[in-house]
């Protein structure tokens, strides 16, 4: 598994590529100001970019570049308050897929001076004409380590491996052993391991993800056995944790353990830190609060988010009866620089408050709904495993389409997918159908409190 990674949004990557390759065949430069994700894995996140103007460079040619130190000083001013990391990025217009001797000497001269100003990790990086980025990181004693993976998160997902940077940029073909091999190097996180979540997790395990992190605080109950994979009556009788049960069974699929159970409410520091260790995030929950946390994790840690939900609304019939109105599923793909689940109306401040009130005092919530003070939360009809499987499959297929493109149309047309089985309809909404509000949490990383929520501050009780 990659121990050191660098992530940036597709929007920032496009901005950098346009600046670094203006069309004159000469090198260009920028400074990346990076936060990092909390936890044991070193995941650096590009938060700010200081582009060095071409006309301010002292020298620019096809193989070398000299630029004023004032742009590093500007980056230090941004990095110093949070002790962030700086990565000095430049282009190789000729496509040389290695750090040159000139690059090596430059790092040895400049990076020690940056350490004197701030931070404990800094580095350098190169972008090639095809957009591929490779990077390396230094510690204060100038010990160097390669960045194993550079990931770009947008409508499409790009994973650039340090050991394959000289190869063609084309992605592995979907549904092949090459896809399986790459998945074996990635980590997925599933929030919610119940009806849809257990089916999503099962697919991720069978597809070959190198590590699968499961987050859920609930125990197995008898009523769950008709829809949660890998559970038994014995598990319910002993009220075992859902994540522990699933991990125990799924870890038998391979010679080594790769499924990591995290028995915790998603609104805890333990759960949020665990989610931040992943490369891709799946949200399979039935509460709005949990979805709001997944939304924040996506933004703060620059993770692609796949959210799935199902519902079976009913309608009144004559004689006070009820009938199935629809059996429906929804899959939303959210990337950090795009519209959030909040922007798309999946949850609002009002129904988050209503849900919190319902958890704290169901009677007061019912009374307020009757008085019309707040919007009621629609009661979810019981799920069935066939509907869950349909939705969970669509969710994982959405990930495959983003990471290993096979669609005839652009992925931007599929920000949301809805299927209505009673009507026999599947609908898609494009990204431009939703307004993306600016987020103060974008690439926030480990800034305290985590996700901007005091409850997730260091030292808070889990």
Give the label of every model feature segment.
Residues 1-87, 93-157:
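Conserved beta-strand-loop surface patch within small alpha/beta domains used
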Residues 120-122, 255-257, 301-303:
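A short helix->loop->beta-strand "cap" motif at the edges of active sites that frequently abuts
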Residues 214-254:
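Glycine-rich phosphate-binding loop and adjoining beta1-alpha1-beta2 segment
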Residues 253-269:
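S-adenosyl-L-methionine
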């Amino acid at each position: 598994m990659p121990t050191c990674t660098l992530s940036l949004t597709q929007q920032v990557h496009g901005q950098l590529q346009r600046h670094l390759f203006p069309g004159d065949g000469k090198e260009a430069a920028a400074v990346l100001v990076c936060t990092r994700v909390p936890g044991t894995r070193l995941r650096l996140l590009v938060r700010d970019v200081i582009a060095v103007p071409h006309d301010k460079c002292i020298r620019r040619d096809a193989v070398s570049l000299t630029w004023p130190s004032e742009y590093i000083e500007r980056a230090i001013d941004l990095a110093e308050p949070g002790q962030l990391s700086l990565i000095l990025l430049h282009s190789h217009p000729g496509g040389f897929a290695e750090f040159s001797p000139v690059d090596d000497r430059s790092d040895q001269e400049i990076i020690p001076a940056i350490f004197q100003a701030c931070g404990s990790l800094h580095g350098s990086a190169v972008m090639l004409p095809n957009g591929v980025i490779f990077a390396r990181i230094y510690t204060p004693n100038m010990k160097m380590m390669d960045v194993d993976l550079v990931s770009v998160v947008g409508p499409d997902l790009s994973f650039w491996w340090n050991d394959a940077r000289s190869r063609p940029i084309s992605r592995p073909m979907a549904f092949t052993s090459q896809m399986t091999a790459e998945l074996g190097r990635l980590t997925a996180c599933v929030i919610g391991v119940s009806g849809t979540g257990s089916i999503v997790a099962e697919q991720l395990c069978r597809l070959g993800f190198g590590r699968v992190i499961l987050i859920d605080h609930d125990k197995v109950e008898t009523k769950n056995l008709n829809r949660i994979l890998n559970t038994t009556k014995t598990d319910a009788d002993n009220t075992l944790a859902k994540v522990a049960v699933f991990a125990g069974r799924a870890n038998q699929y391979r010679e080594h353990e790769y499924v990591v159970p995290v028995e915790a409410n998603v609104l805890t520091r333990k759960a949020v830190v665990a989610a931040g260790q992943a490369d891709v995030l799946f949200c399979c929950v039935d509460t709005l609060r949990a979805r709001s946390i997944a939304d924040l994790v996506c933004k703060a840690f620059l993770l692609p988010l796949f959210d799935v939900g199902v519902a079976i609304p009913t309608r009144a019939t004559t004689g006070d009866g009820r009938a199935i109105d629809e059996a429906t599923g929804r899959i939303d793909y959210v990337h950090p620089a795009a519209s959030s689940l909040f922007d798309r109306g999946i949850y609002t401040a009002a129904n988050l408050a209503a849900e919190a009130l319902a958890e704290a005092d169901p009677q007061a919530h019912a009374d307020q709904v009757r008085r019309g003070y707040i919007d009621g939360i629609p009661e979810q009809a019981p799920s069935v495993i066939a509907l869950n499987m349909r939705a969970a499959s669509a969710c994982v297929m959405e990930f495959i389409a983003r990471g290993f493109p096979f669609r005839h149309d652009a992925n931007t047309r599929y920000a949301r997918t809805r299927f209505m089985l009673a009507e026999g309809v599947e609908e898609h909404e494009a990204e431009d159908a939703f307004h993306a509000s600016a987020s103060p949490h974008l690439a926030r990383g480990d800034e305290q409190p985590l996700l901007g929520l005091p409850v997730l501050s260091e030292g808070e009780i889990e």
